[in-house]
Amino acid sequence: MRKKIDRLTIKGFKSIRDLSNFSLGDINIVVGANGAGKSNFVQMFRMVREMVRKDFQNFIATHGGAAAFLHNGLKATKSIEAEFNLGGESYGFTLTPTADETFAVSESRNGENVDDAISGWVVYHFHDTSERSPMRQSEIVEDCAYLREDAANIAPFLKALREDGPEGIKSYREIVAAVRLVMPFFDDFALTPVRFGPAEKVKLTWTQKGTDYPFQPYHLSDGAIRFICLATALLQPRPPSTIVIDEPELGLHPQAIAILADLIKAASARTQVVVATQSPLLVDQFAVGDIVVAKRKDGATALERLDEKDKIGIDKMRAANPNFDDWLTRLGCNRES
């Protein structure tokens, strides 16, 4: 049984001074203006996961040292405190900065499966779609156990699904069908292994309807390859208990954003989904209760889940079709309060 996050508390972490007993649902669409703290909320998931994976101090060192994680720095904040409740189990910690720019860690656990759930969290970021991006390169066929955060192993992962028995094949076919909705000319992935010395590698080759010519990853637009990665993450047969996706809307056509929303909804039956976005079109696809507004309040990040009392105002915004700044302002995202 998947262990989703029911509630979380985090204090003193970056722009998040005090977020207490905040509830997460199956779908959590976090929207806010630049600087509201969405990225810090996303990074919190990475940090907690690395604590459980025992790679925490290296994570802190490579991201600026302890002071970079404390709300307004060492002088303002003496520690970071957090607690996560997952299906009746819990994990909490206190982080106290040390003289060598690391943290002294005090942890508490209640439950046998909490470490497995947290260590499996994945924060997907498919921002780099450049010609040299990992997702466009060849990767060894053995790198297929799970989809990497930057989709560097998208080709071997898809190849493994296609050869993984009924469950994997079903997932693979669903991914292909989703891609065809966005790219009607798309036929299938080729994924033909090529030997490089002692290793076999595969890259994201594909075919177009009406021809067997093997198109290369560089033939895919930024939006197309990003959507392939998103569809794969959301339709994978054995997802982690919680997945976080940072700004999935980048480079996507409005029609693709609507299809993405359908994939998120379908995935939420099997995994908890947290999405950080600036896209009003993406937000507009979800129920009011799925939306979490991030804004600055008294110099810190505040998160607020919308409810039915907000629905009338949102419906008015939709009818008026405001631009994004107006839309954010009316939600309270652009105001320092």
Region roles according to the model:
Residues 1, 258-337:
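C-terminal lobe/lid and adjacent interdomain/linker elements of RecA-like ASCE P-loop ATPase modules
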Residues 1-57, 61-77:
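Pre-Walker A-like glycine/lysine-rich segment at the N-terminus of P-loop NTPase domains
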Residues 20, 241-242:
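The start of beta-strands in P-loop NTPase/AAA+ ATPase cores
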Residues 21, 120-123, 291-293, 303:
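Conserved beta-strand scaffold positions in the cores of enzyme catalytic domains, especially
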Residues 27-29, 242, 272:
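Residue-level preference for the first positions of well-ordered beta-strands
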Residues 51-238, 323-336:
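Phosphate-coordinating catalytic segments in nucleotide- and nucleic-acid-processing enzymes
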Residues 246-247:
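Walker B catalytic acidic pair
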